[in-house]
Amino acid sequence: MCEEVVKLAGIKEYKVNKNPDLEDGDLAILLSESKVKMDSLAIKLNTPKQLFDSIKEVSKLTSHELDDDEILVFFNEYKIALKYLKNHENTHVKVKVLSNFLKDIVVNIGFEITDDNYDYVIYPDYLKGNVLNENSRCVEIPSHTFVSKNPFERIETRYGILEKLI
């Protein structure tokens, strides 16, 4: 999932590896929830702002740090990602959220997170069993396994599902 960010940031020589500690490498660029023993740069890719910041941070490792305008060009093909680079206000939608990665997204869209009197339960596909007895409307969001590895496409898919609730 980090490969697209590495490419966009301008890193030409890299190796994709699911187990960086088992291979030779100078630096692992990985998702923030991953842990390795070697030197690493942890990035987050759940929201458009996190994606933007991650591209910027990774580009600092190259001879040409990208400026904001150069990074914004990458967002031009992705209307939803571009729209949500800044947080929105949609607090009329009240949701219960069952995952930390989804909380980032829900806050960005502007929904109010609550454990009482909510309109929807937002959950990742791997927690489907946890919502079987819910009385509220449940909205399943695909986890990393079931969406594109391209972070822009992943944002478009997940946010597209949640935008229907506004």
Predicted regions and their residues:
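Binding-cleft/active-site segments that stabilize strongly anionic ligands or cofactors
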Residues: E3-P48, V73, E77-I166
